[in-house]
UniProtKB/Swiss-Prot annotation:
Localization: Nucleus
Purpose: Probable transcription factor, which may be involved in spermatogenesis and oogenesis.
GO MF term list: DNA-binding transcription activator activity, RNA polymerase II-specific; DNA-binding transcription factor activity, RNA polymerase II-specific; identical protein binding; protein heterodimerization activity; protein homodimerization activity; RNA polymerase II cis-regulatory region sequence-specific DNA binding; RNA polymerase II transcription regulatory region sequence-specific DNA binding; sequence-specific double-stranded DNA binding
GO biological process, one term: oocyte differentiation
Name of the featured protein: Spermatogenesis- and oogenesis-specific basic helix-loop-helix-containing protein 2
Gene: Sohlh2
Residue intervals of the bHLH domain: 200-251
């Protein structure tokens, strides 16, 4: 049931109006409720209703509100979008209704105002609440409340609040109808006319299209880096997309049906790939990652070569943090299965684990002698330089020297003397290593570490 708070007993004076407020959102809406109640307690009689989005329809049908605050913490769900539709429908019947929309800071610039009269970003401050109230008193009420001067105690309270913030008013508050001006008075303009609204809507659409084109440009640059080099191939957007489609088809054909079924099932059951999530990833982990939070672009080396090499050996493909992470023990304890918790954590590397629990893990950058000595006998980590040609360092000759001394009696070890890969794997591996051997010989000498160093940390994009 919705919570109702009334301040009619707090000394209503002549000339004051009655204000009915509705706060809709998650649990953090109670912070806004305290700020609004403290401000109105000296200026008007208020009735404050706090509810969730499921009860908005019943409340709007039974009551007439003056100001409605809608607070969200992520992209709008279907219930929240329905609440917005009901509020906008109620504005047609109630011309004195002000719709205020509180947007999370992390979604600033990526979420629409949904037709709200005034929108502002978190964090919530009393100055923002003050602006909302003054805007409503000026343009959404016909009572004498707009001409009522604030009492001295209320003015003193906001002066103290402003001084505590260093004398700076929030700069991330904006009106959906018009931006704030620099007047010393109210600092607001009247709502825009219909032509001006259409002009602003056109400008907003243009800005969104520009952002979309920038995202496409960034993704194409990343695809150019990830795709194998082909002499004479065009670098325009259409050619890059066509080459990506052909390359993905080639990779899918090289994988066994069991591996493809496992990847498909993992992507379908993973909530990280739902429509509500911001990150967008391809069907192969660590191939291309896009995140909207930061204006940065990171490219992780594709594990396609390792997948092609070990596709017929009954491997499990899953994401895993660096050695010693909290998820490493969970992987060892569940043979032949993929833990759902692993897919909920974004990690910088991709592990290809054999059924014998030998984990061949790669990451960019050199490794210090101390870190190399700390590896256990069940996990052999091969640190490759940050360039693609270094994959050729993982050859069967190197495996005989590194993997076999660890578990010489293991029947599933790929490096046992006399053990040969299937014909399909040999064909795939030979095509992979042939293009990298020449560049690898001159690259290994330049990648020798001169001293202890830290592994580079992956940064997120978007």
């Amino acid at each position: 049931m919705a919570d109702r708070i009334s301040t009619g007993e707090l000394g209503r004076r002549p000339g004051q109006g009655r204000v009915d407020l509705l706060l809709v959102g998650d649990a953090t809406r109670y912070f806004l409720a305290g700020s609004v109640q403290k401000f109105f307690s000296s200026t008007a009689q208020i009735t404050l209703t706090i509810s969730n989005v499921k009860k908005v329809a019943a409340l709007l049908a039974a009551n007439s509100f003056d100001i409605i605050f809608l607070k969200v913490t992520s992209t709008l769900t279907a219930e929240e979008q329905e609440a917005v539709r009901l509020i906008r429908s109620g504005k047609k019947k109630n011309t004195h209704l002000l719709f205020a929309f509180v947007i999370p800071e992390k979604l600033r610039g990526y979420i629409s105002d949904y037709g709200a009269d005034i929108s502002f970003n978190e964090p919530l401050t009393l100055e923002k609440v003050n602006t909302v109230i003054n805007y409503w008193k000026t343009y959404f009420t016909n009572t004498d409340m707009g001409n009522t001067e604030l009492p001295p105690e209320c003015r003193l309270y906001f002066q103290t609040s402003c001084s505590e913030l260093g004398g700076h008013f929030p700069t991330d508050l904006f009106l959906c109808s018009e931006l704030l001006n620099n007047d010393t008075g109210l600092g607001l303009k009247a709502p825009l006319s219909s032509p001006e609204r259409n002009k602003k809507a056109s400008f907003l659409h243009s800005s969104k299209e520009k952002l979309r084109r920038e995202r496409i440009k960034f993704c194409c640059e990343q695809l150019r880096t990830l795709l194998p080099y082909v002499k004479g191939r065009k670098s325009d957007v259409a050619s890059v997309i066509e080459a990506t489609v052909d390359y993905v088809k080639q990779v899918r054909e090289s994988l066994s049906p069991a591996i493809m079924a496992q990847i498909t099932e993992s992507l379908q059951s993973n909530k990280r790939f739902s429509k509500r999530q911001m990150p967008i990833e391809l069907f192969l982990p660590c191939t291309a990652t896009s995140q909207r939070g930061d204006a940065m672009l990171t490219s992780a080396f594709s594990p396609v070569q390792e997948i092609q090499l070990l596709a017929d050996q009954g491997l499990n493909v899953y994401s895993m943090p660096a050695a010693g992470g909290p998820l490493e023990e969970a992987v060892r304890g569940q043979p032949g299965s993929v833990s759902e918790d692993l897919y909920k954590t974004r990690v910088p590397s991709t592990t290809l684990s054999l059924n014998s629990f030998h984990a061949v893990r790669y990451c960019s950058g050199p490794v210090s002698p101390h870190e190399a000595a700390a590896r256990t006998n069940q996990n052999i980590s091969i640190y490759l330089p940050p360039t693609g040609p270094s994959v050729s360092s993982f050859t069967p000759q190197h495996c005989n020297a590194m993997l076999c001394p660890t578990r010489p009696a293991s029947s599933s070890c790929l490096c046992t003397s006399g053990h040969e890969l299937p014909a399909s794997s040999r064909t795939a591996s030979s095509s992979i290593f042939r293009g990298f051997r020449e560049s690898d010989s001159g690259h290994q000498a330049s990648q020798q570490p001169t001293g202890p160093s830290l592994q580079p940390q992956d940064s997120s994009y978007f």
